[in-house]
C-alpha cells in the first residue's frame, strides 16, 4: 500500500487504479463537452457549458471558489485586535462547526485491566466514558517512580488501516492478534519503535485511545467512511466533529489523573494524529504544548489536482463543513498560541505541497511573533524525509517536551 493518504496512506491497493481509469475516461469526455471542444452534431446549436464536476476531480470552477476563501477571521485579518478576545471568538467559531455539543459526562474510569510491565514503566488498560455516547478502552502507560509526572496524549494516524488504532503507537501487550499488524506499522513509519513506549520509558504518562472506526471501535473499511460521514451529517452530527470532541475529552481525562501534573500535559500525533494534536491544543485548555508530525498546510495549496485529499473518504475525519469560510488550517492551530508548539515536516512528503507548508508556516510564525512568543514555535523541515516519524525525530520531540513542559 503506497504512501499518500492525507491521514497516512492512499486508497487500498487496486482501488485507485480502477477509479482513476474510470475518472479519466468520463472526465475526458466531460471536459471536451464542457469546454466546447467536442464537435456538435450537424445543425445543432453550439453551447459552451461550465460548472462541471468531472468524476474523481475538482469542479472546473474551483479556482473561483478558492478566490472566495479569504479566511476573514484569521488573526491579523479579523477586525478583532485583542488576542484573547480573538482566540475566544475563533475557538467558538470552530466549535460551532463541529456539530457535536460539548460533553460533561462523568468519566467513571475503571483502572487496572490487562496490566503488564515495560522497560521502566507499567502498562494497563483503562475503560472510561469518552463521551455520552459510550465507553472506550485506552492504553495507559505510567513510569516507575513517584509522580505526578508530565503526560502525553498520543493521537494515532489514519493510514487506511483500521484493525489497529492505539496499537500503532503503543505496543499491544495483552492481545497478540494485533502485534504483527502493530509491529509492521511501527517498522513502516516509526523506525520499528512504539512511540508511546519510548515516551513512558523517558518519564511520561501516556494515554492512547482508538478513534471512532479503529481497533476496539471498528474496524470500519475504507469504502465505508463516506457513508459513515454522510450518515452522521444526516443525523445532525459530524465525523470530524466527533473526533475533535473526543480528543478534547481525552485530554481532560488525562490531565485529571492523580498521577499526572496537569500543568504539563502535551499532545502528540503523526499524520492525521498530527492534525488532531494541533486541533486539540487549539480547543483544550488542558493541553500545555503540542507536537505535530507531518500534517500542516494551507487549505488552498492542498486542494490541487492530484492531491490525495481530493478523494474524499478519509478526508471526512478532518472536514468541518463551512469552517473554511472563516479560518484556514494554520489559523485554527493558531488558536493555541502562545503555547509551545512543534511542527515537523518531511521535504519529500507527497501529501503536502512545499508551497502549502511554506504558507502555513508563515501564518503560524506571524501569530506567535505577534504574541512576543516566537521562541515557543518550532518549525522544522527535514528535506530528505517523507511521510514518516523516524527514531531521530522521536528523540527530537521528547527532548523538546523535556524543554517546554
Which residues are covered by each model-predicted region?
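Mobile cap/lid helix-loop segments that gate and shape the active-site cleft of serine hydrolases
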Residues: 233-234, 289-333, 353, 357-361, ...
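N-terminal export leaders
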Residues: 19-28
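N-terminal secretory signal peptides
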Residues: 1-19, 32
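Cap/lid segment of the alpha/beta-hydrolase catalytic domain
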Residues: 156-245, 302-304
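Short beta-strand element of the alpha/beta-hydrolase
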Residues: 148-157
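C-terminal catalytic histidine-bearing segment of alpha/beta-hydrolase fold enzymes
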Residues: 367-405
Amino acid at each position: 500500500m503506497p504512501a499518500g493518504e492525507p491521514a497516512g496512506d492512499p486508497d487500498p491497493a487496486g482501488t485507485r487504479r480502477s477509479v482513476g481509469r474510470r475518472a479519466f475516461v468520463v472526465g475526458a469526455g466531460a471536459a471536451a463537452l464542457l469546454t466546447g471542444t467536442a464537435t456538435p452534431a450537424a445543425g445543432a446549436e453550439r453551447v459552451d457549458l461550465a460548472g462541471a464536476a468531472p468524476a474523481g476531480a475538482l469542479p472546473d470552477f474551483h479556482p473561483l471558489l478558492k478566490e472566495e476563501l479569504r479566511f476573514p477571521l484569521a488573526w491579523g485579518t479579523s477586525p478583532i485586535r485583542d488576542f484573547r478576545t480573538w482566540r475566544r471568538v475563533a475557538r467558538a467559531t470552530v466549535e460551532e462547526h463541529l456539530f457535536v455539543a460539548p460533553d460533561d459526562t462523568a468519566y467513571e474510569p475503571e483502572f487496572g485491566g490487562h496490566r503488564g510491565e515495560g522497560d521502566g514503566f507499567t502498562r494497563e488498560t483503562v475503560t472510561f466514558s469518552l463521551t455520552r455516547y459510550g465507553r472506550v478502552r485506552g492504553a495507559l502507560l505510567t513510569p516507575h517512580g513517584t509522580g505526578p509526572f508530565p503526560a502525553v496524549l498520543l493521537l494515532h494516524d489514519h493510514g487506511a488501516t483500521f484493525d489497529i488504532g492505539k496499537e500503532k503507537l503503543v505496543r499491544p501487550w495483552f492481545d497478540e492478534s494485533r502485534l504483527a499488524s502493530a509491529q509492521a506499522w511501527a517498522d513502516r513509519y516509526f523506525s520499528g519503535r512504539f512511540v508511546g513506549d519510548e515516551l513512558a520509558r523517558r518519564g511520561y504518562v501516556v494515554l492512547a485511545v482508538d478513534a471512532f472506526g479503529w481497533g476496539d471501535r471498528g474496524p470500519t473499511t475504507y469504502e465505508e467512511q463516506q457513508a459513515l460521514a454522510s450518515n452522521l451529517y444526516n443525523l445532525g452530527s459530524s465525523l470530524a466533529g466527533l473526533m475533535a470532541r473526543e480528543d478534547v475529552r481525552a485530554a481532560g481525562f488525562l490531565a485529571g489523573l492523580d498521577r499526572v501534573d496537569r500543568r504539563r500535559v502535551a499532545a502528540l500525533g503523526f499524520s492525521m494524529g498530527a492534525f488532531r494534536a494541533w486541533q486539540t491544543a487549539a480547543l483544550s485548555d488542558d493541553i500545555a504544548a503540542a507536537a505535530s508530525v507531518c500534517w500542516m498546510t494551507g487549505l488552498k495549496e492542498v486542494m490541487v489536482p492530484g492531491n490525495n485529499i481530493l478523494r474524499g473518504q478519509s478526508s471526512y475525519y478532518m472536514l468541518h463543513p463551512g469552517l473554511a469560510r472563516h479560518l484556514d488550517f494554520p489559523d485554527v492551530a493558531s488558536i493555541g498560541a502562545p503555547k509551545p508548539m512543534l511542527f515537523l515536516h518531511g521535504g519529500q512528503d507527497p501529501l503536502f505541497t512545499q508551497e502549502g507548508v511554506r504558507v502555513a508556516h508563515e501564518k503560524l510564525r506571524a501569530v506567535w511573533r505577534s504574541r512576543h512568543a516566537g521562541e515557543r514555535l518550532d518549525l522544522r523541515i527535514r528535506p530528505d524525509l517523507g511521510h514518516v516519524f523516524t527514531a531521530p525525530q522521536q528523540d527530537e520531540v521528547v527532548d523538546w517536551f523535556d524543554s517546554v513542559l
